[in-house]
């Protein structure tokens, strides 16, 4: 059976039980078409995140979960979700709703309008940060730009949206982001 999923959003969750109901509700509001899937990766939570995900899961066919028994790092949670994703366009973001799922949807739409889908990478941009946080982001951006010889800005901003082809080309992706 051919999957209708075009867009996959991966959201790693670690001890996010207090925020899971709001995250789940917001994802239900934003992603209503079968061309979207949301993969919540319980990354070895020690609170009741996994139980909450199981209780809420039956309410929405677009949302599914992956449960890892032990926390193996944020990056491993992302990679577990990416490996399971069915979409041609992939994304990830944080579970704490610092990035609204609507912003991810806008990222998916923007990505779909780019000319070279295989080489495009959509990245969020954070506004209104404290001066120390902004200064740290500037320093990290300078370091990353020098290291990779490509202009990079605020590498930790969310969401991240890219093609399956881009993901498949990763020879040795980092295991922690």
Tell where the protein language model's regions lie, with residue ranges.
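Active-site acidic short loop of glycosyltransferases
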Residues: 5, 33, 60, 85-88
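Short, well-formed alpha-helical segments that are part of the catalytic scaffolds
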Residues: 16-30
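A conserved acidic beta->alpha catalytic loop
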Residues: 42-51, 97
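Acceptor/aglycone-binding surface of glycosyltransferases and processive sugar-polymer synthases
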Residues: 68-84, 89-92, 101-177
